[in-house]
Amino acid sequence: MKLYHYTKFSNFCSIWIQQKLKFSEWTNSNDVYEREKIYNFTQHSKEYKGKMFTSEVFHQFVQNVYKEVEHYKQISFCLDYEEFEGYASPMMWGHYARDYQRSGVCLEIDSSKIKFPQIPKIYRKKVSYRKNLTPTHVGGVDAEMKNAAELFVVKNRNNLFFKKHWHWKYENEYRIVSKECEELDISGAITSVYVLGEDNVTLQSISHIIMDSEKVGFLNVGGLRSLKLNSMNLYEYNSIQEEIKYINEKGGLS
């Protein structure tokens, strides 16, 4: 499966050198409804197997769940769309290449080559989108148990981490979530690097960084049209740049 990770050029440099993706704080999610559904706990039940909890115990449990959720981190990817491949999303490029230098970068990653650790635990899944996000109801758990909050979050992870509001559907997101993992080893998993336009500074900079690599190719994106530049020497690269210029002058690729 192909995964696409959009990022800034400055971040790409670090990713390429280290061959790792860093997990980001889950609380930095761009979907306010996603965060709100976690903090909108409904007092579904204070009873568990005939045991009734006091309001103080129940309130403390909810607070512990808040804290537990905030310990989780995530890495977000984009999947292929029905109409086009994941690297060619106009809205995703609008987020990451909107400056005048169009300095956004998209990495194509072969998911089968990602080195997922056995420990700590990692959860990964395609995000589903809902027009109405329901809160995660607190109930069916012994609130006085020492690790009650931890078990509750694991049990309800699909609703907590893998559902977003319908308005974010264009992201077509695939998400990797972990509580303890700080970075993901993607050495050997990057198959292509994508930039927006053949005449921007970002493409020139990337060419100097990975020109000698046989693992990665360049993809020039003009709208939804593309021309792939595989690893090559500088002469071949410049020759194809002239070809791109000629194609664009003639009205683009057919």
Where does each model-flagged region fall?
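Partner-binding and oligomerization surfaces adjacent to conserved cores of proteins
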Residues: 1-254
